[in-house]
A protein has these predicted regions:
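Hydrophobic, well-ordered secondary-structure elements that form the walls
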Residues: 170-171, 193, 219, 240
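Conserved PLP cofactor-binding pocket of PLP-dependent enzymes
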Residues: 172-193
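Flexible, small-/acidic-enriched active-site or ligand-binding loops
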Residues: 203-243
Length: 243
């Protein structure tokens, strides 16, 4: 309901098709983050002026204030942003080719091409430098208008490669912003996340281990303190003995 009224579901999905629901409980998470910021600002103001204040938080208002350039497109450019799958909306001044998600041999890879230099490197990578000076592709808008054909060319280049092979070659050799799309099992095992210790493995006993997320930051003097709630009846005897 909050995503509907806040204007987000209208933007999510394929062009010409029904809106799609976002996974998880995004309004709850986002409102909690904004509430944390509001509380810290209020505490800072209390320390500065000695005056407290009453805070109001709304999931709906949180979503409505997160639209950024979507609102600018509507009110300044007169362009109503709409569902456009994994690409920029062509009617927008932000339109460009290269922000797209394409299939490869073992899943999907996301490209974030947005500048002229990146476009030229993409053309060189797929062996189509002739496109750089082609009048049909010499502006961002023209490339966006021909995105289906360009998707076909890039897909031919990546089709037989794995996500990791594409990620390494595009980022390390060509300096292009790309990323493999990972599922949660892959995220939990990711070497970078494990090195940064943002996940916590909790032993449940009986050889059962569950992984929890911790915090998206690392503080030099703080470590997450995560534990389990008591099991059923775990403290019953101690409680009755003292009461």
């Amino acid at each position: 309901v909050q995503l509907d009224l806040g204007g987000y579901l209208y933007l999510t999905g394929e062009r010409g098709k029904e809106p799609l629901k976002l996974p998880g409980s995004q309004p709850d998470y986002l409102t909690g983050l904004k509430a944390s910021a509001a509380i810290h600002i209020a505490l800072w103001e209390r320390d500065r002026s000695g005056s407290g204040q009453f805070l109001e938080m709304s999931m709906l208002e949180t979503l409505a204030t997160l639209h950024q350039f979507t609102m600018e497109m509507t009110t300044f450019e007169g362009v109503l942003r709409m569902r456009n799958g994994n690409q920029w909306q062509r009617e927008s001044s932000f339109a460009s080719y290269g922000i797209t998600t394409l299939p490869c041999s073992d899943g999907y890879i996301c490209f974030g091409i947005s500048t002229e230099d990146q476009w030229e490197r993409l053309c060189a990578m797929i062996g189509r430098t002739d496109l750089i000076d082609d009048p049909d592709y010499d502006t961002r808008i023209k490339r966006a208008d021909n995105s289906e054909y360009l998707d076909t060319l890039v897909t031919e280049w990546i089709a037989d490669r794995t996500r990791q092979e594409i990620f390494v070659e595009t980022s390390e050799i060509w300096g292009l912003p790309t990323a493999p799309i990972l599922d949660m099992a892959e995220v939990v095992k990711d070497d970078q996340f494990r090195y940064r210790e943002i996940f916590y493995d909790q032993d449940l006993g009986d050889s059962q281990v569950v992984t929890f997320p911790t915090y998206p930051y690392i503080a030099s003097k703080m470590k997450p303190n995560i534990g389990l709630p008591p099991s059923l009846g775990e403290h019953t005897e101690d409680f009755l003995a003292t009461n």
